[in-house]
Amino acid sequence: MKINTLQSLINQQITQVGHGGQAGRLTETNPLTENSHQISTAEKAFASEVLEHVKNTALSRHDIACLLPRVSNLELKQGKAGEVIVTGLRTEQLSLSDAKLLLEAAMRQDTAADG
């Protein structure tokens, strides 16, 4: 899935739910009607798809500050210049707001590399 398509899906789900705290999904299931407390296959697929785009992305200070309450969900490393880099996920879920922020960071990095 292209990064722009994934970003559109995230924005659509945030609009549908009304906030970004909900775990993202790759299917058309309505997060408001699901009652399961288990991590669904769609949530795992969503997190995996986002990770594919954001792995090895350097985060800004603002990104880190926004992710701080949930930073334990991410695998991070320090780059050679002291930057914080996303290397993986420690959970099989990712909130819509975190996914949106991480994809925006990946887009910034891609734009800077192309510039």
UniProtKB/Swiss-Prot annotation:
* Stretches with biased composition (Polar residues): 27-39
One molecular function GO term is: protein tyrosine phosphatase activity
What is this protein's name?
Answer: Yop proteins translocation protein M
Q: What SUPFAM superfamilies does UniProt report for this protein, alphabetically?
A: YopH tyrosine phosphatase N-terminal domain
What upregulates or represses it?
At 37 degrees Celsius in the absence of calcium.
Provide this UniProt record's keywords sorted from A to Z.
Plasmid, Virulence
Against InterPro entries, the record matches this protein to:
ProtTyrPase_YopH_N (IPR015103), ProtTyrPase_YopH_N_sf (IPR036484)
Return the annotated region ranges for Disordered: 19-39
Q: What does this protein do?
A: Belongs to an operon involved in the translocation of Yop proteins across the bacterial membranes or in the specific control of this function.
Q: Which gene encodes it?
A: yscM
